[in-house]
Amino acid sequence: MAQFKRTLVTTALPYANGPVHLGHLAGVYLPADIYVRHKRLKGEEVLHIGGSDEHGVPITITAEKEGISPRDVVDRYHRMNLEAFLKCGISFDCYGRTSSELHHETAQEFFLELERKGIFNRRTEKLFYDAEGGRFLSDRYVSGTCPICGSTEASGDQCEQCGTHLSPMELINPKSKISNATPELRDTLHWYFPLGRYQAELERFVNSHEDDWRSNVLNYTRTWLKGGLNDRAITRDLNWGIKVPLGEAEAVGKVLYVWFDAVLGYISFTRQWAEEQGDRDLWRHWWQNPETRLVQFIGKDNVVFHTLMLPAILMAWNEGREDGIYNLADNVPASEFMNFEGRKFSKSRNYAVYLGEFLQKFPADTLRYSIAMNYPENKDTDFSWTDFQNRTNGELADTLGNFIKRSIDFTNSRFGGEVPHSCTVQEWEGLGIDWYATQSQLDQAYEGFHFREAATIAMDIARAANRFLTSAEPWKAIKTDPEAAGRTMALSLNLCHALSIALYPVIPETCDRIHRMLGFKGGVDGLVRKCEPILKTLLEPALPMGHKLSPESEILFRKIEDQEIQPELQKIEQLVREAEAREAGAIEVKIEFKPAIGFDDFQKVDLRVATVRAAEKVKKASKLLKLQVQVGSTQRQVLAGVAEHYSPEEMVGKNVLLVANLAPRTIRGEISEGMLLAVEGEGGRLFMVEPQGEKINGQSVQ
């Protein structure tokens, strides 16, 4: 493994089109902060970079719906999310914005360098143009009739009624959502990034990390690589975004695609931080020095943008250079999802707990601890109000808080607020805690991104401390053997100190309060010395005899009463009822039944069970898979708009339902001989209808 002298940590940029919720916190921002705080405690050089993703069509649509400017939208949510992060103790060194002038300059610099090298491909294509509005229309700005189900409210990217993924040109009677005029097809030039050019280099890069990257990261990435990497558009016709920095007429009215500009935010925000330090070139120390380790925290829905897209852009920049070479990520610890009361967080359906709202009711450290103990490292986990209440009351209040307060209050009342005894290493080791193993395991857990394990190890120290104090009974010993009671309290106070260090990355505000109650000025990070890991202080007692405590103690955690949780549970019950009713078809809004047909008409539809024998991606069509399906003794080719929901490997071997007598049609230059049936679940996720049973291939649906 490479030896690094410093660590650059980045976090996926939250989209400035809504507030962050607890799922975002659990998947990206809390684990990154825990890791960064641990590195700082070790006296290591570490930089924590984050910021807002502020471009793209959803933002312009929100602005138009509200009658405000895109700038107003991103200003609102950038401020809202930053305030929530700070209140939660997320310790960014810089939290930037992709709408900033410096970011625009950085992204344009990358574009121009790659354009100068001749890396981009230019491609003329036909897109809808609104002559009345004077602009080209992205897919979400076009509506019309779905060619599959006949819904008159289909959008240019998807029909919400039947779930079919579409292109604007497939709509019947298309209309502009801006002017309601019928758009016309016009030629427009766009720039494409040739991902396939870097496929071999990307494969080598990914394979070099097969022993240290998480399996989910490797699997997602290799699925894309196996399907072959296609050219990807990096420009689009839009008014809000980073302008294509070329003087030619074809570049007018075009901006950089948000996928290209957003991942460069990590670089521009580091440049911003450097300028704030008074050294404009300091950012190169973090991005272009091979002794710097780059660790990028993301959710699993962002994997390929950080394992393929950004590395490919940096590879293109580095091509042929002798200096100014960018580092690639050394690790991309993508988490799984944390669900909410058994269901996926969904902002569009308002099924979420938003971070800012949560922190108005409960302390940040109670949330940080609860999420750390449910960290979705290798599988989806679940946040529930009951679990949150139980962990706060049982583990934080009764175990940790109770021990700290008892130790400090008893020392203040019976020993004059001073550590009453010198603790020997033998006494420390006699507590029944293997300090060498504990310190090593704790360090390895934090370093290895195993944050649930780290929180558990630290809380186990608190449990052992409680058992020690309860069994020693210093309140009884003080009457007959004051010296024994003093030894007990000296050990207990040193345990308080150990806990303030072990738990600091997870619950920093609480540990700073413990630190101050122990008589220290400032917080735990005041103990940091360069290249001197504080965790090693766990190996022996740290508080000498006579060390003065604060005369005042605090209740670290108040218990959460049932009546505080009940409104939240009732709110969830209502949201679940609405979701279940929606799934069952009980909510009549949003449901449009098609016109009635006669039985004879229905009988004309030939639905049969088919088996997928082969599958591959369709070039230049990110939503389509080309499938070879067996129906009885015949084989057909079917194009299905499920590429964003199933990999080719996942489709092979499935039994599916095929509309077998649908007239063949050409899609993206390929013949499709039928249509497969799927249902749309929450968040637009498509699920194939998969018939069950033996020897059913070719059978008709009765």
Curated annotation (Swiss-Prot):
Cofactors (names): Zn(2+)
Cellular component GO terms, alphabetical: cytosol
GO molecular function: ATP binding; metal ion binding; methionine-tRNA ligase activity; tRNA binding
Motif 'HIGH' region: chain residues: 14-24
Gene3D superfamilies per record: HUPs, Isoleucyl-tRNA Synthetase, Domain 1, Methionyl-tRNA synthetase, Zn-domain, Nucleic acid-binding proteins
GO biological process, one term: methionyl-tRNA aminoacylation
EC number, UniProt record: 6.1.1.10
tRNA-binding domain: residues covered: 601-702
SUPFAM superfamilies: Anticodon-binding domain of a subclass of class I aminoacyl-tRNA synthetases, Methionyl-tRNA synthetase (MetRS), Zn-domain, Nucleic acid-binding proteins, Nucleotidylyl transferase
Domain of life per record: Bacteria
Binding site for Zn(2+): 146, 149, 159, 162
Residue sites binding ATP per the record: 347
Cellular location(s): Cytoplasm
Protein family according to the UniProt entry: Belongs to the class-I aminoacyl-tRNA synthetase family. MetG type 1 subfamily.
UniProt cross-references to NCBIfam families, sorted A to Z: metG, metG_C_term, PRK00133.1
UniProt function note: Is required not only for elongation of protein synthesis but also for the initiation of all mRNA translation through initiator tRNA(fMet) aminoacylation.
Name recorded for this polypeptide: Methionine--tRNA ligase
Organism of provenance: Chlorobium luteolum (strain DSM 273 / BCRC 81028 / 2530) (Pelodictyon luteolum)
Encoding gene per record: metG
